[in-house]
Amino acid sequence: MPSISTNIILAFITALLGMLIFRSHLMSSLLCLEGMMLSMFILSTLTILNLHFTASFMMPILLLVFAACEAAVGLALLVTVSNTYGLDYIQNLNLLQC
């Protein structure tokens, strides 16, 4: 179990570093966010099953619901920005540039 947890934590850190490095494009940021949410889901599921937390069996499901909502809003924003500006740069999302 510790090696699985270590690998999942490393996957989360890798996605976080990818978010910090590739922050200019919206699509790259969304992919890194999805990787972070997936690693958080797997880690929370393994922790709950391993430690027998019967009161918190719904937490991974709620995490998946929020991840799906985040993905839907992110893709809608990506389509809107791509249709408006023709690019998917995050700098186009600044409201002060109007």
Curated annotation (Swiss-Prot):
The chain crosses the membrane at residues 2-22, 29-49, 61-81. It is found in: Mitochondrion inner membrane. Pfam families: Oxidored_q2. Its main location: mitochondrion. It catalyses: a ubiquinone + NADH + 5 H(+)(in) = a ubiquinol + NAD(+) + 4 H(+)(out). Disulfide bonds: none annotated. InterPro entries: NADH_UbQ_OxRdtase_chain4L/K (IPR001133), NUOK/Mnh_C1-like (IPR039428). One of its GO terms (biological process) is ATP synthesis coupled electron transport. One of its GO terms (cellular component) is mitochondrial inner membrane. Its EC number is 7.1.1.2. Keywords: Electron transport, Membrane, Mitochondrion, Mitochondrion inner membrane, NAD, Respiratory chain, Translocase, Transmembrane, Transmembrane helix, Transport, Ubiquinone. The keyword NAD applies. The keyword Mitochondrion applies. GO terms for molecular function: NADH dehydrogenase (ubiquinone) activity. It is a multi-pass membrane protein. Core subunit of respiratory chain NADH dehydrogenase (Complex I) which is composed of 45 different subunits. Core subunit of the mitochondrial membrane respiratory chain NADH dehydrogenase (Complex I) which catalyzes electron transfer from NADH through the respiratory chain, using ubiquinone as an electron acceptor. Part of the enzyme membrane arm which is embedded in the lipid bilayer and involved in proton translocation. Belongs to the complex I subunit 4L family. PANTHER family: NADH-UBIQUINONE OXIDOREDUCTASE CHAIN 4L (PTHR11434:SF0), NADH-UBIQUINONE OXIDOREDUCTASE SUBUNIT ND4L (PTHR11434). This is NADH-ubiquinone oxidoreductase chain 4L. It comes from Eulemur mongoz (Mongoose lemur).
